[in-house]
Amino acid sequence: MASYLMQFSFTAQGIQQIKDSPARVEAAKQTVRAMGGEVREFYAILGSAHDTLFILEAPDDAAVARMVLAIGSRGYVRTETHRLFTEEEYGTVIRSLP
């Protein structure tokens, strides 16, 4: 499976209901699992435009797009997602350059 960085920024609704955030994190993890992925790590972030993040694995980009839309549609966070490449994957990409 591929690795992804999914960053979350609270919406006004999300920050107004911040005490419910831990339950929403668990709900988001369940959404990822239900769509064939697995959250490997969760972090809250200081000093960033983002508030929290997941490092996750997923079968493909389409699955991640579904995850982002499902989580974002709840109205508590906005998301920014990036594909991550392991050192081995990065090496494979570099070795394939012409």
Annotate each predicted stretch with a short phrase.
Residues 1-34, 38-40, 44-50, 69, ...:
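Short S/T/G/P-rich N-terminal loop/turn motif that feeds into the first structured element of a domain
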Residues 8-10, 54-59:
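Short beta-strand-to-loop capping motifs
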Residues 58-85:
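An amphipathic, aromatic/His-enriched active-site/gating alpha helix that lines ligand/cofactor pockets
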